[in-house]
């Protein structure tokens, strides 16, 4: 049984069978309130996502001549505690298990993470497509984020339409009622 401590509260990683991943036990009381799962939710599984977030240089809405990097979408591989691939995460947002069951969802809330890291996040999921590991998942937390913020390179008229990928990593914790 593997045990580690993560940067946000005390998070233990314990071997488990769900999705072939390690289960991350998250003490919601240690997380910022906006990204805590509602009462009655139970952790079903967890995975670490490693991949890239794509940003595109676009003109700011209602600000002619001003530009900014805009998030386009993610592409990540989901790994279990044994470091084996257990699924993938991509635009939608969509989390797809290796058993091809998948879920989409909508962001409920975010909370700041460490400098240079994308925010922590809480997502309310839609019903799963396909039977499998994603069946019954109702919420997903993104915690322990590393990297992934918009590029620091210049975004101006000359760069308009250009895209850049930024490396990131995060733990995804899946819950069901």
Predicted features along the sequence, with ranges:
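Bacterial N-terminal signal peptides that target proteins for export
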Residues: 1-8
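Primary mode marks residue(s) on the alpha4-beta5-alpha5 output face of response regulator receiver
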Residues: 24-52, 61-177
